[in-house]
Design a protein with these regions (language model features):
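Terminal (and in a subset, N-terminal) low-complexity or junction segments at the ends
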Residues: 2-205, 211-716
Length: 716
């Protein structure tokens, strides 16, 4: 074998203990200039660190090749940029250019590419302007990177100027230039211009199709992205590569389209694209956004390689789909792996703790963030505040807000605390904070109004809620379905059912299930069967398989003793394979979480708790408690109804708390559904008889029971 061939096949090429140029000076054969360049090119390809790169740079400087071979100089520049050393890259670029009458296109394009890839738009444009002033030939490799820089920084005007230059130079119909134009116009939101260029292209390769698909996906136009993806394959016969699959998977995830998720996953599997990390991550995220965490976990478990994005996607998928416990278990696996949690991981896990609502878990995770010395930016700070509010520690949330420097608070900071006040029934405090927010010059957004309207609803502040709703129109904040749902809920809870119904009829667009659902809940609270039928009819057209709406209507019928209608609804559910969500409650016991539900035969404390509940029922009756039998939604005898009420999951959890948790320690219970009227009444009596503070978090809000009263003032 030729000596050079032997050297090129040898690994590693660099002796870390000797200068690189010694490899050349000690060689026993004469190199031709061409063979030396090949040698260095191979060294550069295998170079994977800045120290090795500096050795190569030094050797090229010693031999003089750094100035006589622009190609090698360009490769060094590319490598410096790759290792985030743009200053050294630019210094080399300037030193090489001194040796020439004017810069070469290749070197300028290389430096422009380096700047564009890291989003340094103004440096990119300055260098582009320098090329034009010095008469350096601007070609079809220059424009795409200039467009990329403009796209990353949303510079529409500059992008259009460069577009004009490209047309004057005759590159307007070049494939690479057109692909760059599609990208810059799409990212800047100019979809008419973008689509016009795309449609007028004489030839469209995979890069152009992918650019257009990605543009639609990133602009949250998933339907258009999916149509183009199918057209590209079916009409043009082009096979999607990994970049296209990543974009279309994101589009399918935005749509929550389970059927197309299966199709995209199948395509990626058949073409072996799923083995690429970026594709595997996108397929995983797609399934979680479609609500299929089982399929996502299967993808995750089969991945040969995982990075922090893989872990975060799966953790986020569990959390967003209400499987926070699974997220906590997976987080433990992550800590045992080689992958280190990041601030993004922390943000996801704080949300998981907030979803579960257990204070000791939230505190533990907060301690983990501090011990890991993670930077707590405003987003993570807001998430921690939200977590404490949702874990029942409103005082901690308020203190956390006050501890954020005013200059570091954003609208989200205010929104979180307004929402926290609302969840705990402190409507007036929420309104005061809302006023303070505006006084400090922070503009309320649609999230703010959702929080403040909800706070007014839970506190029964009808007039104030109406004013806030009118304020939205004054500030030109777009009215969304969620805002109408909040107002309908507010009016409905106050018994103003007709006004709530009139508001729905006046909506400019068809009401969503959230709006009709708020009305149906109000009808259940106030026993309005006729209006409830109207709400239920609309709901079951929009969401025919939503179990909760069947249950609400069934409860309305049951409260009116319409057992025949109850039976019909239950039969409809059975025929559709729908099951009523089982009520369950959980209680914090030290650092443990215990669950209770009526049919639980395996709870180790079952007999003790049932016995305690029976004694509690007697004590409460002696204090004046009367069971609300309308909450027993079964066609049975009165005494059977009373016995059934005693075994509601939240009552069992509170009975356990009275039995096992030391006096002076707050009893904290979480229920997955709305607490019923009878349990609400019972907890007031228990808090008075035993002088205990009981905090119950149900599906809608917090109830703080103490001394025989509730923080909601019986308005929930």
């Amino acid at each position: 074998m030729h000596r050079l061939g032997s050297l090129l096949s040898h690994k590693p090429l660099l002796n870390p203990r000797a200068p690189l140029y010694s490899l050349i000076s000690s060689s026993t054969f004469s190199y031709s200039p061409n063979s030396i360049e090949i040698f260095y090119e191979h060294l550069l390809k295998s170079c994977n660190g800045s120290s090795s790169l500096k050795q190569i740079h030094s050797a090229l400087t010693t031999t003089g090749l750094i100035t006589t071979s622009p190609h090698l100089g360009g490769q060094i520049i590319i490598k410096y940029a790759k290792f985030d050393d743009l200053n050294r890259a630019r210094l080399l670029f300037d030193n090489i250019n001194v040796c020439y009458d004017k810069p070469t296109s290749f070197l300028c394009n290389t430096m422009i590419r380096a700047y564009a890839n890291v989003g340094q738009c103004f440096e990119t444009l300055k260098l582009y302007s320098f090329m034009r002033k010095t008469g350096t030939f601007v070609n079809n490799y220059t424009y795409p990177f200039v467009f990329k820089a403009c796209a990353l920084n949303l510079l529409v005007r500059e992008g259009k100027v460069v577009h004009g230059d490209a047309l004057k130079k005759g590159f307007g119909s070049d494939l690479y230039v057109e692909a760059g134009l599609v990208d810059v116009y799409a990212k800047c939101g100019l979809f008419v211009d973008c689509r016009k260029i795309f449609d007028e292209m004489s030839t469209k390769d995979l890069v152009c199709w992918t650019a257009m698909i990605t543009a639609y996906e990133q602009a949250e136009k998933p339907e258009e992205a999916l149509v183009l993806f199918k057209k590209m394959q079916q009409e043009e016969g082009l096979l999607a590569d990994s970049i296209a699959v990543v974009s279309v998977a994101s589009a399918v995830g935005q749509l929550g389209d389970v059927r197309n998720a299966h199709t995209v996953h199948g395509y990626a599997f058949r073409k072996s694209l799923i083995e690429e990390l970026c594709v595997g991550n996108s397929i995983l995220a797609m399934h979680t956004k479609c609500g299929n965490t089982e399929k996502a976990r299967l993808v995750f478990d089969m991945m040969m390689e995982r990075d922090v994005i893989s872990w975060n996607s799966m953790l986020s998928g569990y959390t967003q789909n209400g499987q926070a416990t699974e997220a906590l278990l997976l987080f433990d696996e992550m800590r045992d792996s080689d992958c280190q949690p990041t601030p993004v991981t922390a943000l996801i896990m704080v949300s998981a703790c907030a979803y579960l609502g257990f204070r000791h878990l939230g505190r533990k995770f907060h301690d983990f963030i501090v011990d890991s010395r993670m930077e707590i930016d405003t987003n993570l700070s807001n998430a921690l505040m939200d977590m404490y509010a949702k874990c029942g520690d409103l005082e901690k949330a308020v203190n956390w807000f006050n501890g954020i420097p005013p200059t570091e608070r954003n609208a989200g900071s205010w929104n979180v605390l307004i929402s926290g006040y609302g969840m705990h029934g402190h409507g007036k405090e929420a309104l005061e904070l809302f006023s303070r927010m505006q006084e400090e010059g922070v503009e309320p957004n649609h999230f703010t109004f959702t929080s403040i309207l909800s706070a007014c609803s839970h506190a029964g502040l009808i007039d104030e809620g109406r004013k806030c709703f009118a304020e939205m129109k004054r500030l030109s904040v777009t009215l969304e379905d969620k805002h109408h749902a909040c107002v309908v809920d507010m009016l409905g809870r106050a018994g103003l059912l007709q006004e709530a119904f009139d508001l729905i009829k006046e909506m400019p667009s068809p009401p969503s299930d959230g709006v009709w659902g708020a009305l149906l809940l109000a009808c259940k609270i106030h026993g309005n069967m006729e209006l409830g039928k109207t709400a239920a009819s609309n709901l079951l057209q929009l969401e025919p398989n939503h179990t909760g709406y069947y249950v609400l209507m069934s409860n309305i019928y049951a409260a009116s003793n319409k057992w025949k209608e109850v039976w019909k609804l239950r039969q409809d559910m059975k025929n559709k394979g729908l099951k009523k969500p089982a009520a369950f409650s959980m209680i914090e016991y030290g650092e443990h979480i215990l669950g209770f539900h009526t049919a639980d035969q395996e709870n180790p404390y079952r007999h003790e708790v049932y016995k305690k509940m029976e004694s509690l029922a007697i004590e409460m009756k002696m204090a004046g408690y009367v069971p609300d039998l309308s909450c027993a939604l079964h066609d049975v005898e009165e005494e059977d109804k009373e016995r059934m009420l005693n075994y509601h999951s939240e009552k069992l959890a509170v009975a356990f708390g009275v039995l096992k948790i030391d006096p002076g320690i707050v009893i904290r219970v979480t229920k997955n559904l709305r607490v019923c009227n009878d349990c609400h009444s019972a907890f007031k009596y228990i808090s008075h008889i035993y002088q205990r503070k009981i905090i119950v978090r149900d599906a809608n809000r917090f109830h703080h029971f103490q001394g025989g009263t509730c923080s909601c003032k019986d308005y929930w």
